[in-house]
Design a protein with these regions (language model features):
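Conserved class I S-adenosyl-L-methionine
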Residues: 1-44
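Nucleotide donor/acceptor-binding cores
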Residues: 46-47, 109
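Class I SAM-dependent methyltransferase SAM/SAH-binding core
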Residues: 50, 56-103
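A short acidic, Gly/Pro-enriched loop at the edge of an enzyme's catalytic core
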Residues: 102-113
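A short beta-strand submotif of the Rossmann-like class I SAM-dependent methyltransferase core
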Residues: 116-117, 125
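A short, conserved alpha-helix within the catalytic core of class I
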Residues: 123-132
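Conserved catalytic/acceptor-binding region of the Class I
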Residues: 133, 137-203
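Conserved Class I S-adenosyl-L-methionine
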Residues: 182-261
Length: 261
């Protein structure tokens, strides 16, 4: 279990509880997201890359065709279990480690790039950033990426958020807007912020896949009881039945490119 005072008012959550649905419904990054990473000079043939808090390995699997050798690490053994299963099924050659990011131990200049997708907020950044700096080769890249749905631009997303809050009032992952993140203070002296890519994009869903994606979020399956999840899901599916079976939800993607000094 993870608990932080600045996330969900300290309510405990465990991503390992979401793994089955996470594996099935959260591989939703668009092709342009992966192309943006390559355009920043990361994930290409001959490079070694590390993905922190890899979950079920969505990002390294999506980057496989560009030729880099990837390692994925996650605090949850169950997430890593599914990451390995999915990689084996797709023929992806990815190494996986079950470990908190702050406890990883690699040699100096082990990687050309490090990625952290949807997860940087969970880390002890003062501990982790000097380690990432050590692991990166000279001029190496640390990419912090975020992809949030936009509830103020989607009626479905807004109604889904309201239902999450009904069953989990402590959930703090709501109300996201089009905004770019600030450079972490503890990056000063270690990294230069070379690029920040930001754009909106529509992600296609069906009623089933959107329900699964929301169910696998921190506010539901990672933190509620089975009885609470069952009640939420019945109400959520009833809400979705009022809309077409296929629809798009606007998301905002940001990629912050921190280059090792």
């Amino acid at each position: 279990m993870i608990s932080r005072k600045d996330i969900d008012c300290g309510k405990e959550f465990d991503w390992g509880l979401t793994s089955e649905n996470y594996a099935k419904y959260r591989d939703i990054y668009p092709a342009e997201f992966y192309k943006s990473i390559v355009e920043l000079g990361c994930g290409t043939k001959g490079q070694r890359m590390l993905d922190l808090a890899t979950g079920t390995g969505v990002l390294p699997r999506g980057m496989q065709k560009y030729g880099a050798k990837w390692t994925g690490a996650d605090i949850s053994k169950n997430q890593i279990k599914y990451a390995r299963l999915l990689s084996e099924a797709s023929g992806a050659d990815i190494d996986y480690i079950a470990s908190p990011a702050e406890e990883l131990d690699f040699g100096a200049e082990s990687f050309d790039g490090v990625t952290a997708a949807q997860c940087f907020m969970y880390f002890n950044q003062e501990v982790l950033l000097p380690k990432i700096h050590k692991w990166l080769k000279p001029g190496g890249h640390f990419l912090i990426t975020i992809m949030d749905w936009l509830p103020f631009e989607s009626e479905i997303a807004m109604k889904s958020e309201k239902l999450i809050l009904k069953y989990n009032p402590a959930w703090s992952g709501c109300g996201r807007k089009r905004s770019t993140p600030s450079v972490p203070k503890c990056a000063e002296g270690l990294f230069d912020a070379k690029n920040i890519i930001a754009y909106a994009t529509d992600i296609p869903f069906t009623s089933e896949s959107w329900n699964g994606r929301i169910k696998a979020c921190r506010g539901i399956e990672a933190s509620l009881t089975s009885a609470e999840i069952e009640k939420w899901e019945a109400e959520h599916k009833k809400m979705l039945a009022e809309y077409p079976k296929s629809f798009k939800v606007p998301h905002f993607i940001t990629i912050m490119d921190l280059v090792k000094i």
